[in-house]
């Protein structure tokens, strides 16, 4: 690392979207510091996927933060008593994890301030997505304003930018962009119910969006199913 390198902290779940974001940041010349969270999610295979993606795309450092969001509950992803739906539903789905992106971005902000990074990347999307309130442009813009009010760096004029490069892309556009940038999607796990080997259920909303993205893009889908 040198003082001339520009650094970015990137939220990396291990799924298709966040892997694409790492590749985009790398293509822009960023030294990539990736951050994942062991938050009590039922699909823990995504943590192994995140480590694989970070390694494959040359992250400078990959950090896994332990959180116990299952202690809060309220989501099918953190509470085993709530079933993951296998068909689209009206409104905000039960797979929404309360305040998840707010918590994740806050910790990424802390690491960015320590690293001297001014850019934080997140793979939220408002086109082909599940309807989560913390994936909307208004949320990203509001968090950026808060970040620059709540930090020493922000107060001293070294502002942060929250980058959401997938915000207005369709899932097929994301797939095409990632493949053009060399993302190996076989390393990724998107399924909400993935088994320990990272194989997907093929039924949940995340699996549906992923499959539709590959089909619409005309690209080969490397997803493994159980």
Swiss-Prot record:
One GO term of the biological process aspect: queuosine biosynthetic process
Entry EC no(s): 6.3.4.20
Catalytically driven reaction(s): 7-carboxy-7-deazaguanine + NH4(+) + ATP = 7-cyano-7-deazaguanine + ADP + phosphate + H2O + H(+)
Official protein name in the record: 7-cyano-7-deazaguanine synthase
Pathway: Purine metabolism; 7-cyano-7-deazaguanine biosynthesis
Secreted in keyword set: no
Binding site for Zn(2+): 191, 201, 204, 207
InterPro entries given in the database record: QueC, Rossmann-like_a/b/a_fold
Domain of life from the UniProt record: Bacteria
Organism: Pseudomonas syringae pv. tomato (strain ATCC BAA-871 / DC3000)
Family according to the record: Belongs to the QueC family.
């Amino acid at each position: 690392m040198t003082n001339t390198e520009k650094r970015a902290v990137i939220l990396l779940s291990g799924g298709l979207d966040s892997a694409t974001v790492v590749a985009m940041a790398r293509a822009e010349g960023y030294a990539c510091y990736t951050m994942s969270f062991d938050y009590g999610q039922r699909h823990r295979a995504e943590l192994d996927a995140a480590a694989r993606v970070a390694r494959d795309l040359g992250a400078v450092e990959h950090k896994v933060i332990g959180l116990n969001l299952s202690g809060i509950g309220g989501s099918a992803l953190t509470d085993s008593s709530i079933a993951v739906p296998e068909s689209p539903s009206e409104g905000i789905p039960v797979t929404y994890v309360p305040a998840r992106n707010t918590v994740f971005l806050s910790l990424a902000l802390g690491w960015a301030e320590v690293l001297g990074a001014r850019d934080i990347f997140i793979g939220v999307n408002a086109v082909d997505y599940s309807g989560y309130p913390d994936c909307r442009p208004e949320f990203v813009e509001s968090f950026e304003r808060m970040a620059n009010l709540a930090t020493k760096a922000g107060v001293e004029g070294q502002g942060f930018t929250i980058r959401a490069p997938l915000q207005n892309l369709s899932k097929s556009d994301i797939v095409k962009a990632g493949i053009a940038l060399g993302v190996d999607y076989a390393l990724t796990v998107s399924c909400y119910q993935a088994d320990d080997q990272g194989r997907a259920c093929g039924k949940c909303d995340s699996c549906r969006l992923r499959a539709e993205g590959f089909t619409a893009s005309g690209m080969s889908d490397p997803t493994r199913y159980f």
